[in-house]
Each structure stands twice: as C-alpha cells, then as structure tokens.
C-alpha cells in the first residue's frame, strides 16, 4: 500500500468562533442537506467572482482597492487581497459555470454522490490549512461575495456522512483530500508509481507535507459528498 500525505487536525478560528456556532445552530443543523447544497453552490459562485476580480486586477483593468478593503486581526487577515495567490496563466478565462451533479451508487457503500464543480481560483497551499478550520474565510474584506462565515465545504459533514472529498487545482498543482469531522487526510501519495518517482509536495506552516500532482489543467475545485 502506497503511503499518502500527512493529515491535518481540525481547528476553529478563534476570531469567528461565536459567529460560526450561531450559524450552525440556526440553519445548518436544522436543514442539513438543502443548506449544504446551497452553501457549496454559493462557494462555487464566489470562487468564480474572485477569479473575475483577480483577472481584472492582474490585467491592469482595476485596482485591489476597487474591490477590497484592508483590515487586520485574526478574523480578517486571511481575507486581505494577496496578488501573489493568482496567476493569469492558470485562471480559466472561458468557463464560468458551477456544475452540480448527482450520481447514483458511486460512493462508499454504493451511496449516491453529490458534487459541486467550479472553475474559480482553486485552493492553494496557503488555503489548505483552512479547509477544516471552522470560521476560516477569505471573503470578509469585500462586498463581492455571498459568503463570509467560514463554513464552506465543511457543512457537508452536517448531513451525516463520515467525510467529504475535495479535489482542487491551483496554479499547476492538483491536490486531493478527504475531510473528516476531526481531521483532513491529504491523499495524493508520496510516490507516483506511474511516473516512477516521488510526487512533489508543499509544506504547511505546522510542517505538514502535502503532496500534489503537477497538471496543465486550469484552476478549479470539486467538492463531493455521499448522500445516504
């Protein structure tokens, strides 16, 4: 068995702790499946809008301050615009769709699978740490997005599934991970048997190595979860 990448423990962003639990109590736990599909589709739309803004700024048609304000503090630092996160060569300038698919008998134990696929900015190394961190958000310093609460794909766990899967491409790197209640397992293996060599990796702030597969595909993200 080929060993995969290392895992990452679940966290709660301290700056947004109260807000997160208020939202979970009032909406997510009461209507988990409709809320999950709505949240994931909204995330996809937000990723597309972020891409459009990044293209405008990178191509000189707009300035960051046209769309973003700069604020600091634990709740806002991750939402400040960072031009180094984006690369025009990897952003899909043609496809702006958010695809929602439902496939029968394709999940673990032959359950059905819902997938939401966007062609936005992708999830790069610096955002991977926020994948399972409740309250983590990159949207609090702009009025151009729907979301800012820091729930994201994590809402899929409220439907009763054991995990959800994220496959994402960011600037030539394809990552894949299974996200559980208390951890995220990065599942691109350390060694690529087809290429006969190790897969490259990035290192997170806590030293976790996350392997990826190099790709020519444009930035995109697919979030999938089982439906019982």
Set out the residue ranges of the language-model regions.
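Bergerat-fold ATP-binding/catalytic subdomain of histidine kinases
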Residues: 130-145
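Acidic ATP/Mg2+-coordinating residue in the GHKL
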Residues: 118
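A generic secondary-structure signal for well-formed alpha-helical elements
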Residues: 44, 48-52, 135, 139, ...
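Bergerat-fold GHKL ATPase/HATPase_c domain
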Residues: 1-99, 125-132
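Glycine-rich G1-box
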Residues: 121-122
